[in-house]
């Protein structure tokens, strides 16, 4: 395919793109060792900007990664594989030396359709495990909060009635004591549910980095039982969408603050005129990442539509290095999650 690719500053990334393709996200990921490179891509019928993250995995060996990009909506299904291969080939000369593969986490395109694309050519390979969730639930906010609540299922309505009598939700105002109290709850949740927790430094970076607060901001919503913090969620806001990223809560018999936290975030997203609330993370197509099934029941209780996307896909620049990296990566994924079946694997993103 004919395309023209130029390096640009990360500040020139399109503000209309998903937050994962923004200068804000490049700054966040810098705190976990990824360096952001921005590009403009011009084709015959479209043009877009692209964020590529690069991380050194070993001496002289780096992985390049495109989070939720490039856009595919204007392509025919038969063109997607060729487009991804051509983009990887042409962008290689603009990436640092030593990059052994380009990893795509493609955007969500399919509404309630589990027949997603996979790829297996000499150099383009769909992976057994994905970096980011392959399924999500999105709620249309365009008609306002009251209209959204009409779509809540009875499970959510019952849980909210109980939670409203026991908990209060407030926005974190930036004080360290409240953040640390929530982080303790987060660590307890990680131990209980068996996931790998993010560091305090990384989670702070989500809330501190915002070069233009009118475009991308994140908020920590805290749930209180009296004066005690018993839960909280981090939600990322942009002009087009709000995305639930991280959450934690203590367990109570017959009651949960998680429903009240999500309802508060949905209300806040409506007040900010976001078009979509993304609950971010349910099992993928055809039973992939089935360990997220419990989350699907919770997230779909707020209504919305499930969306699916293709699994993570790598373009191989150096096949020998890639095979070595994939072996150790698979071992790490399974050991961190105690996963025996490859179909249930989903690493911490």
Question: Regions from the language model: what does each represent?
Answer:
Residues 2, 14, 27-28, 58, ...:
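Active-site/acyl-donor-binding loops of N-acyltransferases
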